[in-house]
Curated annotation (Swiss-Prot):
This is Methionyl-tRNA formyltransferase. Its EC number is 2.1.2.9. GO terms for cellular component: cytosol. Pfam families: Formyl_trans_C, Formyl_trans_N.
Amino acid sequence: MAESAPLKIVFMGTPDFAAASLRHLLAWDGCDVVGVYTQPDRPCGRGQQCRPSAVKMLALEHGLDVRQPVNFRDEADVQALRDFGADILVVAAYGLILPQSVLDAAPMGAVNVHGSLLPRYRGAAPIQRAVMNGDAVTGITIMQVVKQLDAGPMLLQKALGIGCDETSGQLHDQLAELGGRLLVETLARLRAGTIMPIPQDDALATYAAKLTKADGLVDWNRTAVEVHAQVRGVTPWPAAYFTLRREGQKDVRVTIEPGTIGPLLEQPAVPGTIVGLVDGAIAFACADRTYLVRTIRPADKKPMTGEAFWCGYLSRCEGECPGFAVCEGA
């Protein structure tokens, strides 16, 4: 292909992370987005109303042809993809494992925008798992799509530091933008023939499993640093939670926003015990020191400060108030 010819692209993606890549493609004069594939509209939220994906909304704003097959088992759907005549497919958080017939639908194959430094964190939740594991660095990988999950040869990578108080939601937004920029750079170099795929080392591969609500259950038996990483990693979803049990009173299911690592425990305390109020924050005992929570939300209530929660829910406790995590209601 001549370097001056725009790449004809079919884009495949669904959530906000993918929409950032599509936005960068639409702003680049080196390509022509001829079609967009995204997941079918699905019920979401408390009202369970069907809502279009972020990618669909952006595509429609730009008058693009949007397709939403449930899968590609029907040959007619595969043929419809071929009929776009794309040079290459671009995939970003699409939500479907693509069959070989789809990968073969464009002469240059398919490339994917992945939110980690592969081969680390293959799978559905690379951003959240990196934060939950306390990693200091993550990044974006643009790689060729093969049948095996996230295992294709790498085209470009770029690292990004993870702040010690950064949540997965905040990191997601940074990586989404980085992914869009790196995608355009990758496609420009593919178009010019100046990029060489690098095989992944499967021996170094790790897997980032999709998060469930159970991942938000705070494990106070960990160190405060590990608890902080867990809470940051599950923010905004599924959110960090536990059940506070008070002797002679009703259990309280609460969620918390990321706090700060507090001082070492002055004396041994059962992990999960509330050991005091420190500068307006509730101090929870961890394995080694305290974790200070400044924003807490009881079930079916609005978020409140740690001090307000202390006064409203713990004022009848004498001394230490026992609180520990349970899975019920996850």
